[in-house]
Amino acid sequence: MSIILGIDPGSRVTGYGVIRQTGRQLTYLGSGCIRTSVTDLPSRLKLIYAGVSEIITQFRPDYFAIEQVFMAKNADSALKLGQARGAAIVAAVNHDLPVFEYAARQVKQTVVGIGSAEKSQVQHMVRTLLKLSANPQADAADALAIAITHCHVSQNATQVSESRLNLARGRLR
């Protein structure tokens, strides 16, 4: 059993989603958004760090998964996003969590089956996969999708390494 915290970083709104993985079963534990209403960036980064730290303390995850920075048209926005990611990652590292990063396209491909999926499609599939009664907020849905992707990737990596080990021993199942 593992608890995974997924983070969809943003300098104004950072989504988070927490799930438990037991074998192939995924269970929703919580989600939401850290909203920063202050205007100066250093204060927003402080709020992101504090918010992520609080979530880690509350849910005690085993793994931390976060979306990678994508190339934005606006360089200033990309820099702010990178700084928001940094604040969240530092919170995870300060709590001794292993950090995993996933590209947005990989997350959409894993959860929806299409790397160019729309936000509404991601919300719908997250709702379906986690058996939620309603669509989560967009940023929270993205964070949950990141956590789901981590479960999928880590499960596949475990299966591949077990297959290689069996092959090395002369057994292939």
Curated annotation (Swiss-Prot):
Family indicated by similarity: Belongs to the RuvC family.
Residues that hold Mg(2+) 1 according to the record: 8, 139
Protein name: Crossover junction endodeoxyribonuclease RuvC
Gene that encodes it: ruvC
Entry binding sites for Mg(2+) 2: 67
Catalysis: reaction(s): Endonucleolytic cleavage at a junction such as a reciprocal single-stranded crossover between two homologous DNA duplexes (Holliday junction)
UniProt KW Disulfide bond keyword: no
Enzyme class, spelled out: hydrolase
Source organism per UniProt: Cronobacter sakazakii (strain ATCC BAA-894) (Enterobacter sakazakii)
InterPro entries according to UniProt: RNaseH-like_sf (IPR012337), RNaseH_sf (IPR036397), X-over_junc_endoDNase_Mg_BS (IPR020563), X-over_junc_endoDNase_RuvC (IPR002176)
UniProt keyword list: Cytoplasm, DNA damage, DNA recombination, DNA repair, DNA-binding, Endonuclease, Hydrolase, Magnesium, Metal-binding, Nuclease
